[in-house]
């Protein structure tokens, strides 16, 4: 037991030093600063309205609730790709989890990337001396990408047969082509308790508050500040407040069928007024999902998510649908979601994920 706690201390120690160092610096609040991760992990969860804190039990648990990694029994690998806004925004997720048989613990590594690629950089296509476009401007146009990335290192174990817990060390990187980038870090923690067929889960994302450090490469802007009269932006430090996720799930066997229901509530502390349920600066985001599985082979799913309001206080709820197939050690899942409210013109999201156990 003593060795176990020493391992946890060594795992957390570098990040605790970062937090102490950051406390001496000035940070501005970053509303929606970690929202690129809200896309999630795995198409199964999307089909269930992202209600997954209590029922997650595979490699994707590193995102939904790291305590769920304690259920991983063999090497578990997952990959997911999705596109939004007519393919403009791409999202990729990959993860691997490995159980440590001797200690009944699991370690995992996850990677997330959301980006817009092939953006035209037209700055050098402008002749600043003539104040006109250059001849053959296409020869001066370069392409760049804007991307948000995250790396999550996870550890989970069981405190008892009913109780499991897990922690994440998270590193994020935002890159705006060659012009600017930011690095950030935080810790997540989660617990899950099982009572028969009922599970209760709690997950605190960015438990330590995410600290992000921006830097701008002013050399990339040349003398455009003098030409256009625009002020070149400067880097600043940002902080992202914690998010508290709570969920409950219940499963019931009905002959060859297994029926699973889940309900989650996400509590954010960023004064998000677009959500229907608010209490001061705290917003409450409910998620509900239902899954029916036949002989542990074929699954159909449905859910509700994104309860929002518009300027006229009209309430909108986004429905989700999904399906999954399990063939030996291969899991293929599909999820579908529609943008709600005033964003319906932005289309729908189709998500496919693949998971393999070895």
Regions found by a protein language model. Give the residues of each.
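Bacterial N-terminal signal peptides
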Residues: 9-19
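Subset of outer-membrane beta-barrel
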Residues: 25-358
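Bacterial Sec-dependent signal peptides at the C-terminal "C-region" and cleavage site
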Residues: 20-24
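Bacterial N-terminal signal peptides that target proteins for export
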Residues: 1-10
């Amino acid at each position: 037991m003593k060795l176990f706690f020493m391992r946890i201390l060594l795992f957390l120690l570098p990040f605790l030093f970062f937090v102490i160092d950051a406390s001496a610096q000035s940070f501005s609040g970053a509303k929606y600063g970690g929202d690129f991760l809200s896309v999630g992990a795995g198409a199964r969860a999307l089909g269930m309205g992202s209600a997954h804190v209590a029922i997650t039990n595979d490699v994707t648990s590193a995102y939904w609730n790291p305590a769920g990694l304690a259920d991983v029994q063999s090497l578990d690998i997952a990959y997911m790709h999705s596109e939004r806004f007519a393919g403009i925004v791409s999202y990729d997720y990959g993860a691997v989890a490995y159980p440590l048989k001797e200690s009944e613990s699991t370690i995992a590594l996850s990677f997330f990337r959301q980006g817009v690629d092939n953006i035209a950089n037209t700055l050098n296509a402008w002749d600043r001396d003539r104040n006109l476009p250059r001849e053959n401007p296409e020869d001066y146009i370069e392409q760049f990408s804007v991307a948000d990335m995250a790396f999550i290192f996870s550890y989970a174990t069981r405190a008892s047969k009913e109780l499991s817990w897990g922690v994440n060390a998270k590193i994020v990187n935002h890159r705006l082509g060659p012009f600017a980038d930011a690095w950030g870090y935080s810790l997540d923690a989660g617990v899950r308790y099982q009572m028969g067929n009922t599970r209760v889960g709690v997950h605190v994302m960015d438990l330590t508050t995410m600290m992000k450090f921006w830097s701008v490469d002013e050399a990339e802007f040349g003398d455009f500040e003098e030409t256009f009269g625009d002020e070149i932006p400067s880097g600043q430090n940002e902080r992202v407040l914690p998010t508290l996720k709570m969920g409950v799930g219940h499963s019931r066997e009905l002959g060859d069928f297994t029926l699973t229901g889940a309900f989650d509530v996400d509590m954010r502390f960023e004064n998000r007024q677009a959500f229907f349920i608010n209490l001061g600066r705290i917003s409450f985001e409910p998620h509900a999902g239902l899954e029916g599985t036949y002989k542990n082979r074929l699954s159909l799913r449905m859910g509700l998510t994104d309860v929002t309001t518009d300027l006229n206080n009209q309430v909108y709820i986004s429905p989700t649908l999904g399906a999954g197939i399990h063939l030996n050690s291969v899991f293929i899942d599909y999820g579908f979601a529609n943008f709600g409210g005033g964003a319906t013109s932005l289309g729908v999201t189709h998500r496919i994920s693949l998971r393999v156990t070895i």
